[in-house]
UniProtKB/Swiss-Prot annotation:
One of its GO terms (molecular function) is transaminase activity. The modification N6-(pyridoxal phosphate)lysine is found at residue 267. It is found in: Cytoplasm. PANTHER family: GLUTAMATE-1-SEMIALDEHYDE 2,1-AMINOMUTASE, GLUTAMATE-1-SEMIALDEHYDE 2,1-AMINOMUTASE 1, CHLOROPLASTIC-RELATED. Its main location: cytoplasm. CDD domains: OAT_like. It catalyses: (S)-4-amino-5-oxopentanoate = 5-aminolevulinate. Belongs to the class-III pyridoxal-phosphate-dependent aminotransferase family. HemL subfamily. The gene is hemL. It comes from the Bacteria. This is Glutamate-1-semialdehyde 2,1-aminomutase. Its cofactor is pyridoxal 5'-phosphate.
């Protein structure tokens, strides 16, 4: 494959955009390549600036559950744009999407729309502190909750990709309010809660850790967190930005039967447009301005294009058989990739929950960030490059999840597995 036009665009971009990209992982530094510049996408296919075509398992980092450029979603966006792109005033679209979100998540009696997952988690943390009158939060090593200062501590994902334990520019006074524990280590959480319970406002976590690959909760972990929070009047914030509407219509909370006091959403609910949301019980949400004293605002919050795309997407994934299809196709892909690794004699551990997956270059299992970091990132980088050259677009980091969409066919998956056989033998 030729990548000459993408390389030319990258050189232009580096002159006017820091690092040539607007989000660090897109730079492909962790895999020793230069980034692709995408021209268009349809279904599960990306087409880059050189005309190369790829089967896509990034899905814009998760939102594209129905595939790229779905006609119903595009139609909804175009119809909304024809009426106006932004008003700075309420619309009925905001109510409609909020009603659908609250119906999907019974513990979300009220929801506030924002423009990104970072805004959602940042605002939920502020609300938790305002409601409890406490300052500290507890998060988990390898869980990423956006790039707000207090959450860039042992944050996984892009931070792990570049080997940076925490970002410069985060004041020590901010970081000292953030406690961290190993994911799936309930004993360590109990010890931290016992020591800091008088100052602890919230525990925040990804219910399936998708920013260290794909790490599900061990049996009893979520239930134990829920019990600790109830016992000590700490708010449990479940960050479903990645898992919401992805692993089931009601997210990981429906899948595992554990509910948060506050929930953060994003990705799928915007249908590929910038959106986030956070919500919870009425007695908590009433503390938000204008009813309460906890301030949160946004110029483009509830943007009509994003609301329309979200409404159209949720309608599509409510159709009968959607999640059964996602499960069947994802299981078929996972088994094929496992067989390809075994045939090539390459140590690999494929972990999957629903249509989220990660192929770790190690024997596994992976239950924590420490486990994830034991992966052979050099082998992954070679595999990534081979798969790209064979027409398969994976996330350019060992520490990111991959995603299957409704647009992936059995034929697409067969081609992917064939590419994996060739790629794994080559590395």
């Amino acid at each position: 494959m030729s990548y000459s036009r993408s390389h030319q665009f990258f050189e232009r971009a580096r002159k006017v955009i820091p690092g040539g990209v607007n989000s660090p992982v897109r730079a492909f530094k962790a895999v020793g390549r230069q980034p692709l510049f995408i021209e268009r996408a349809e279904g599960c296919t990306l087409v880059d600036a050189d005309g190369n075509r790829y089967i896509d398992y990034v899905g814009s980092w998760g939102p594209m559950i129905v595939g790229h450029s779905h006609p119903k979603v595009v139609e909804a966006i175009c119809d909304a744009a024809a009426r106006g792109t932004s008003f700075g005033a309420p619309t009925a679209l905001e109510i409609e999407l909020a009603e659908q979100v609250c119906a999907a998540f019974p513990n979300m009696e009220s929801v506030r729309m924002v423009s990104s997952g970072t805004e959602a988690t940042m605002s939920a943390i502020r609300l938790a502190r305002g409601v409890t009158g406490r300052d500290k939060i507890l998060k988990f090593e390898g869980c990423y909750h956006g790039h707000a200062d207090s959450l860039l501590v042992d944050a996984g994902s892009g931070v792990a990709t570049f080997g940076i334990p925490a970002s410069p520019g985060v004041p020590a006074d901010f970081a000292r309010h953030t406690l961290t524990a190993p994911y799936n280590d309930l004993g360590r959480v109990r010890a931290l809660v016992e020591e800091h319970k008088a100052d602890l406002a919230a525990i925040i976590l990804e219910p399936i850790a998708g920013n260290m690959g794909c790490v599900p909760p061990q049996p009893g972990f979520l239930e134990g967190l829920r019990a600790l929070c109830d016992q000590h009047e700490i708010l449990l914030i479940i960050d479903e930005v990645m898992t919401g509407f992805r692993v089931s219509y009601g997210g990981a909370q429906q899948l595992y039967g554990v509910r948060g006091d506050l929930v953060c959403l994003g990705k799928v609910i915007g249908g590929g447009l910038p959106v986030g949301a956070f919500g919870g019980r009425q007695d908590i949400m009433r503390h938000l301005a204008p009813d309460g004293g906890v301030y949160q605002a946004g110029t483009l919050s509830g943007n009509p294009l994003a609301m329309s795309a979200g409404i159209a997407t949720l309608k599509l994934i409510r159709e009968e058989g959607v999640y059964e299809q996602l499960e069947q196709r994802s299981a078929y892909l996972a088994e094929g990739l496992r067989q390809a690794a075994a045939a090539a004699g390459v140590p690999a551990c494929l972990q999957r929950v629903g249509s989220m997956f990660c192929n770790y270059f190690q024997t596994g299992p992976v239950t924590s960030f420490a486990d994830a970091k034991a992966s052979d990132t050099e082998a992954f980088a070679r595999y990534f490059g081979q798969m790209l050259d064979n027409g398969v677009h994976l996330a350019p980091s060992q520490f990111e999840a991959g995603f299957v969409s409704l647009a992936h066919t059995v034929e697409d998956i067969d081609r992917t597995v064939e590419a994996a056989h060739r790629s794994l033998k080559a590395i």
